[in-house]
Regions:
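...captures the hydrophobic TM-helix bundle architecture rather than a specific catalytic motif
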Residues: 1-187
């Protein structure tokens, strides 16, 4: 709901002029924001790769949960499966995305765009900061899902934690693509 509201406000505000008291007239104050597209593109790629690693972690957890009952049967050995730390890689990529966002905000500041420069820069910051806050929540969920294994939680509880976190993480990736497109096409 937050992002739908922000999108509606972004599109609505884009078309509205502002009353200027000095001239007693309405002026169009929606300025163009020179976004660091290459850096934002790299961030998008990082987030998409993290969505892939999250999906691999989800599938690994589902497979472990499906095979867990077999391991209790005498004489059945599942062997030593290779355990690749997909959740850990997703966390690292999530941090890389957030660092990239910080660099993008710094680049905007270097180009003279701040939260209060004009309405379009305010919305650009607001949308990306809101996404970063939500992604940080996803990072906390990732760390909780990863710690479930360290805390020896039941396999089904771990699978559910990873599954729910994966759905949220994929939503964050799709939401970022939406924000990226909104900032690019609705300037």
């Amino acid at each position: 709901m937050v992002f739908i509201s922000l999108t509606s406000a972004y599109i609505f505000r884009r078309g509205l002029p502002t009353f200027q008291g000095e001239t007693n007239s309405y002026v169009r104050d929606w300025g163009s924001v020179d976004l660091p597209w290459v850096l934002l593109g790299i961030n998008t790629l990082i987030l998409l790769v993290s969505s892939l690693t999250m999906e691999l972690a989800r599938r690994k957890a589902a497979r472990q949960a499906a095979l867990a009952p077999l391991s209790s049967i005498p004489g059945i050995s599942l062997g030593d499966e290779k355990h690749f730390p997909w959740l850990g890689i997703t966390v690292v990529l999530g941090f890389a995305f957030l660092v990239g966002q910080g660099l993008a905000w710094g680049e905007l500041h270097n180009r003279g765009f701040f939260l209060s420069t004009n309405p379009s820069s305010s919305f650009a910051f607001l949308l990306t900061i809101a996404h970063a806050v939500h992604l940080t929540g996803g990072m906390i969920a990732l760390l909780c899902a990863g710690s479930a294994s360290l805390l020896h939680k039941p396999i089904e509880a771990r699978r559910i934690a990873v599954d729910i976190t994966a759905w949220y993480w994929h939503f964050m990736a799709v939401l970022w693509i939406y924000i990226f497109a909104l900032l690019g096409f609705a300037r």
